[in-house]
């Protein structure tokens, strides 16, 4: 399964990149908009979600636990400096996907113990 982590370039915006990844067969999209205001992330998520659904792809938000439900996302990816996985699980419940950044075996063990998927 291919995963696409969105990014912005002057020639290809977030949605265009997501669209191209989905058309190329991607089945997992992570909307990553570091330092963007929540309103902008939510607006982009509302545009990306139907594209993901149309292509049968999972849609994951980067960092924004508080926007997952409103955006209709399948889950969230948490970086090492974001909310701990166990706190996010309390907010999102058992049915949402929670992933995290793991660069070492110790990171993997920690994330697993906290309840990451």
Language model region names:
Residues 1-85, 90-105, 110-117:
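Conserved N-terminal beta1-alpha1 strand-loop-helix module at the mouth
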């Amino acid at each position: 399964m291919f995963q696409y982590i969105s990014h912005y370039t002057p020639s290809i915006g977030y949605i265009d990149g997501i669209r191209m990844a989905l058309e190329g067969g991607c089945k997992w999209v992570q909307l990553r908009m570091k330092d963007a205001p929540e309103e902008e992330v939510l607006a982009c998520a509302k545009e990306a979600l139907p594209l993901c659904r149309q292509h049968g792809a999972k849609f994951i938000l980067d960092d924004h636990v508080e926007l997952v439900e409103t955006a209709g996302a399948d889950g969230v990816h948490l970086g090492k400096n974001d909310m701990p996985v166990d706190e996010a699980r309390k907010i999102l419940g058992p049915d949402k996907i929670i992933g995290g950044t793991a660069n070492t075996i110790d990171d993997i063990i920690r994330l697993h113990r906290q309840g990451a998927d």
